[in-house]
Structure formats: structure tokens, C-alpha cells
A protein has these predicted regions:
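Structural recognition of the beta-strand scaffold that forms the well-ordered cores
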Residues: 54, 85-88, 125-130, 172-175
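Glycine-rich "HGGG/HGxG" loop immediately N-terminal to the catalytic nucleophile
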Residues: 133-141
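Glycine-rich nucleophile elbow surrounding the catalytic serine of serine-hydrolase chemistry
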Residues: 150, 175-181
Length: 181
């Protein structure tokens, strides 16, 4: 059907803005918390594919915010139950937009490659939020635990809503530094 999730999310990938415009959200920000606004292919991985997503979350004041995230989807078909999601709260990479995990190449550093590969082999969908204001317009919510927590939870919801992930509702959250408080 024309409005099936496959067509909707496929169109989002095909029509996501290119270059730095990817991180500039539409106004007003559509949908509900955890909805994917748009996505684009980022890289082929050992055992999966990485995408960049822009999704809806909420500011520390309860206002709608677009937040970017990196999502890795395992190759192949999941079990009939779907795939679990691991929402990973990484540490601070810096305060500028260019330091956001989705912009800096952080998710491809050698120190975490083995972990990503192992999780993909175990059929996990992995999502890592940039957090409010990191990579996207607005103030970076650094040390605002309530906003960061919402961003990490909404990233998990976005992974579940991202049709290519074929994720189920089983969600695991881990983090350290700013992503763990």
C-alpha cells in the first residue's frame, strides 16, 4: 500500500536533505516523540548497515526538539520476534555541532568497532543519540539529565519506528559519562 511503513520510511531515506542540511529540522517539528523525521544511509558495516536519523524528542522544558542519532541495523532477516534495541548513551565528544557522534565519525573509531560488530552479530539494533542541541540547532543539553534521558529513550523509540530495523519492543539502555547519568 502507498502509505505502508515500508513506503513511508523508504521515502524518508530517499528524500532526506543532503550535506549539513540533514541536521536542520522542519518547522514545526512533526510527529510524536520517537518518530523518525527522516533518515539517510551512512555506511556499510561488518554485519550491518549504519544510518543517520533525525527524530523527534523533547527539550528539558518539554518542547518538541529534533535530535540526530546513528543507528546500526544487522544484515539479514530477524527472527519472527523482531530485533532488540540497544540505546547507547555515549560520552561527550565536545560542545560544537561538529563534535556530534553523527558528524565526527565517532561511531567508526577502532575502540568501539569490535563492540558494534559483536552486537550486530547478536542481531541487536544499536542506536546512539547525539543529544539535544548537539549537531542540531539549539543549545546543547549537556548535563541536563532529564533531557538527555528523554533523548536516549526517544532514540530507542525511533529505532523501533525505523522500519528497516525490524525492531521489537525489547529495549536495553547503557551509557557512560554524560550518557550514563
Amino acid at each position: 500500500p502507498e502509505n505502508s511503513p515500508e513506503n513511508i520510511f523508504g521515502a524518508l531515506i530517499d528524500t532526506a536533505p543532503e550535506g549539513l542540511d540533514f541536521w536542520i529540522p522542519p518547522d514545526p517539528i512533526p510527529g510524536r516523540n520517537g518518530d523518525v523525521i527522516w533518515a539517510r544511509h551512512d555506511a556499510d558495516l561488518e554485519g550491518g548497515t549504519a544510518y543517520l536519523i533525525l527524530y523527534r524528542s523533547e527539550s528539558v522544558c518539554g518542547e518538541p526538539r529534533a535530535v540526530s542519532a546513528w543507528i546500526a541495523v544487522p544484515d539479514g532477516e530477524p527472527s519472527s520476534l523482531g530485533r532488540p534495541v540497544l540505546s547507547w548513551g555515549h560520552g561527550t565528544r565536545g560542545a560544537g555541532d561538529h563534535c556530534a557522534a553523527t558528524r565526527s565519525g565517532y561511531m567508526y573509531q577502532e575502540e568501539i568497532n569490535d563492540l558494534i560488530t559483536e552486537l550486530l552479530a547478536r542481531d541487536f539494533v544499536i542506536v546512539a543519540s547525539d543529544y539535544e542541541g548537539s549537531g542540531t540547532p539549539g543549545m546543547y543539553a549537556w548535563s541536563q539529565s532529564s533531557a538527555l534521558g528523554k533523548n536516549i529513550l526517544d532514540a530507542a523509540r525511533a529505532a523501533q519506528n525505523f522500519n528497516l530495523a525490524k525492531a521489537n519492543k525489547d529495549t536495553f539502555i547503557t551509557g557512560f559519562s554524560i550518557g550514563g547519568h
